[in-house]
């Protein structure tokens, strides 16, 4: 049976503001819990007017306090910006506050423009090459494994708690899959970023998986854009907005927020742009609840996974809520 989860990037709608976007993320998490979604993850983006979620740890804490059962996590913390020790302590605090409900999703992407990376590293170089070593150290801190031979002998992360957050690595390449496998972590493939070749990447993760304190068996899931509506016409209107938003991002066109369908419906595109839009449709599933369910089940079969994480970006928050309600209805039938 397929389980459904949500990744929300706190998108700001054109004409709205970041405060509203963050409040809508919290409201969506509460609705997701009521609807029966398994996880609710929030993202990390910097120096962005369009995406308000810059500090997943803070947002997770608030969402966890406003919900009761749903797992809450990061999708993800961009670890190369930070000290593995500090991340371990942040997530131990979260786990201590809500035991058994916290997921620590990790990534190596910058999550923003180079100037933001420089600022996050106080003008120093962001060294993503150290990411595998950071994963090892983070694991030690989360599970009290730093002994007297560690570079910080016998260092433990506070608070000292009896449980640990579930660790997931996020990625869209074979390199990230191999690192997740070698670490014993869960692996979330970002189909919404890379719509091609993910099936083989997930199979590679499962083949190369090594049990560790992070997990005894492989845990694989796939994240994909989904836009679900009552009619095909409405779904395609939502799709047209996401088409434009993704294309604008590729072309470096600054957006004040996610536009409305009325703002993009008369757009014309060059042959090259039309090809890019068609290619980007491989990253998303658009349609009625019956159509979306059929394609999500096919995606689940292709990836050989029973968990799908859904990313939905719309101008109107009501359209997003409706999409998630219809999706859950489809899988309840």
Curated annotation (Swiss-Prot):
InterPro entries per UniProt: Bact_Lucif_Oxidored, CmoO-like, Luciferase-like_dom, Luciferase-like_sf
Organism in which the protein naturally occurs: Bacillus subtilis (strain 168)
Organism lineage: Bacteria, Bacillati, Bacillota, Bacilli, Bacillales
Pfam family, one: Bac_luciferase
GO cellular component: cytosol
GO MF, one annotated term: oxidoreductase activity, acting on paired donors, with incorporation or reduction of molecular oxygen
Protein name per Swiss-Prot or TrEMBL: Uncharacterized protein YwcH
Family classification: To bacterial alkanal monooxygenase alpha and beta chains.
């Amino acid at each position: 049976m397929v389980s459904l989860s949500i990744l929300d990037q706190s998108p700001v709608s054109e004409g709205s503001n970041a405060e509203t976007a963050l409040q809508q993320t919290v409201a969506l998490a509460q609705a997701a819990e009521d609807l029966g979604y398994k996880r609710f993850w929030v993202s990390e983006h910097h120096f962005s007017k369009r995406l308000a979620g810059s500090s997943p740890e803070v947002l997770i804490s608030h969402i966890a306090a406003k919900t009761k059962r749903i797992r809450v996590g990061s999708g993800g913390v961009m670890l190369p910006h930070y000290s593995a020790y500090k991340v371990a302590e942040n997530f131990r605090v979260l786990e201590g506050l809500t035991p058994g409900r916290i997921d620590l999703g990790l990534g190596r992407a910058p999550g923003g423009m180079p100037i933001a990376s420089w600022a996050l590293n106080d003008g120093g170089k962001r060294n993503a090459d150290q990411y595998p070593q950071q994963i090892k150290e983070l694991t030690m801190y989360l599970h009290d494994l730093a002994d007297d031979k560690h570079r910080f002998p016998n260092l433990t992360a506070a608070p000292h708690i009896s449980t640990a957050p579930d660790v997931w690595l996020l990625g869209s390449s074979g390199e990230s899959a191999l690192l997740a496998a070698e670490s014993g972590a869960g692996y979330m493939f970002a189909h919404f970023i890379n719509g091609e070749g993910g099936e083989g990447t997930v199979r590679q993760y499962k083949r190369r998986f090594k049990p560790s304190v992070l997990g005894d068996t492989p845990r694989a899931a796939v994240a994909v854009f989904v836009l679900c509506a009552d009619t095909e016409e409405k779904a395609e209107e939502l799709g047209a907005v996401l088409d434009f938003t993704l294309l604008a991002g590729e072309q470096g066109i600054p957006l004040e927020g996610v536009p409305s369908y009325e703002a993009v419906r008369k757009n014309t595109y060059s042959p090259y742009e039309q090809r890019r839009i068609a290619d980007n449709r491989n990253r998303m599933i658009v349609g009625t609840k019956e159509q979306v369910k059929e394609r999500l089940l096919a995606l689940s079969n292709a990836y050989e996974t029973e968990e799908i994480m859904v990313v939905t970006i719309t101008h109107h928050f009501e359209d997003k809520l409706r999409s998630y309600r219809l999706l859950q209805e489809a899988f309840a039938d």
